C-alpha cells in the first residue's frame, strides 16, 4: 500500500514516489509511477493498492483507456503494455532507436484508434481494436 498526504507526494516504504500518468477505468483511478515503474489503484482515503511493477520498466510515462482496457507506455524501453485483470501483458516496443532511454511519451484515443507518441525518435504510432498486433507509424 502507498499513502498520500497530498495529491502530488506519496510515500511507499519511506521513499518518495512520483506519479507520472493516470487514467480512470470502471470508476477507479489508476496511476503509474517513477522510479519503480509500478501501477497503483486508488483504494479510498489516503490508500493506494499496488497492482505491481510493469516488466522491468522504470517509469510509466503514459496511460490511456482504449477498447475497455488500460494501456501503458513506459521508459526506458518505449514499451506498450495492457492491464488485463490485474496482470500486465507486453504488446510492443515502439521506439527501436539505439538511444539508451526510449519512451512512449504520450497516449490518446481518437477516431477509434489508440495513438502513442515516442521519444527520442519523435514518431507517432497507432493501432485499432480488432487488428492483430499492428502499429501504424506516422
Where are these regions (language model features)?
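Trp- and S/T/G-rich repeat-edge/linker motifs of beta-rich repeat architectures
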Residues: 1-20, 24-28, 34-61, 65-69, ...
Amino acid at each position: 500500500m502507498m499513502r498520500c498526504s497530498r495529491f502530488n507526494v506519496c510515500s511507499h516504504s519511506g521513499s518518495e514516489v512520483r506519479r507520472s500518468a493516470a487514467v480512470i477505468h470502471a470508476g477507479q483511478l489508476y496511476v503509474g509511477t517513477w522510479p519503480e515503474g509500478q501501477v497503483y489503484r486508488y483504494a479510498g482515503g489516503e490508500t493506494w493498492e499496488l497492482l505491481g511493477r510493469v516488466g522491468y520498466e522504470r517509469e510509466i510515462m503514459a496511460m490511456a483507456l482504449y477498447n475497455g482496457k488500460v494501456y501503458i507506455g513506459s521508459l526506458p524501453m518505449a514499451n506498450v503494455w495492457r492491464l488485463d485483470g490485474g496482470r500486465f501483458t507486453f504488446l510492443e516496443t515502439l521506439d527501436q532507436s539505439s538511444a539508451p532511454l526510449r519512451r512512449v511519451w504520450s497516449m490518446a484515443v481518437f477516431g477509434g484508434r489508440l495513438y502513442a507518441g515516442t521519444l527520442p525518435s519523435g514518431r507517432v504510432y497507432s493501432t485499432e481494436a480488432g487488428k492483430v498486433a499492428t502499429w501504424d507509424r506516422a
